[in-house]
């Protein structure tokens, strides 16, 4: 926060980090991959969770199976991890997905090569996928980190 962060994201569920974020009123998204971790996060008061690593963990099918028993809680997921333009729409179509993260648009190699036009093109493609998905599902993702 001292450096200007408006929210935080982690790959795992670390209770000390969650409590520090809570003390500073920092919107924070702990990482989960199992039902036990979802249950633990919910018991600690967190309803916006990073599903990581999404694709290696089983992708959309795994997230649907993981989310189903918790549907009554209002939990929302932010899948990240090996997601690409080819899988973006599948995640966005899920009602329990608040947002999707992906590094394919600005990967380390592209940044190191200063491939700004490629990064811009990949980001524009992702935004088109988002718009098409919203038009198809009739839903927009109105997600605000603070709640």
Residue ranges and their predicted role:
Residues 70-73, 133:
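Short helix-capping segments at alpha-helix termini
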Residues 22, 42, 71:
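Anion (oxyanion) recognition and catalysis
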Residues 1-14, 26-38, 47-57, 78-79:
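Catalytic beta/alpha-barrel core
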Residues 1-2, 36-45, 67-68, 83-99:
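Catalytic cores of alpha/beta
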Residues 11-17, 50-59, 96-118:
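Glycine-rich phosphate-binding active-site loops on the catalytic face of alpha/beta enzymes
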Residues 21-23, 109-141:
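C-terminal helical cap(s) of enzyme catalytic domains, especially alpha/beta-barrels
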Residues 18, 38, 63, 88-89, ...:
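Generic hydrophobic/aromatic pocket-lining and core-packing "Φ" positions
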């Amino acid at each position: 926060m001292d450096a200007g962060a408006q929210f935080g994201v982690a790959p795992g569920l670390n209770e000390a980090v969650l409590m520090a974020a809570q003390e500073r009123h920092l919107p924070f998204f702990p990482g989960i991959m199992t039902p036990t971790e979802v249950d633990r996060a919910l018991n600690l008061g967190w309803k916006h969770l990073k599903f990581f690593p999404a694709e290696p963990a089983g992708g959309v099918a795994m997230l649907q199976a993981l989310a189903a028993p918790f549907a009554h809680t209002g939990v929302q997921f932010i899948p990240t991890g090996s997601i690409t333009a080819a899988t973006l729409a599948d995640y966005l179509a899920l009602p329990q997905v608040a947002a999707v993260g992906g590094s394919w648009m600005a990967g380390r190699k592209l940044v190191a090569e200063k491939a700004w036009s490629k990064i811009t093109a990949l980001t524009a493609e992702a935004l088109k996928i988002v718009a098409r998905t919203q038009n198809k599902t009739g839903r927009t993702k109105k997600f605000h980190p603070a709640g």
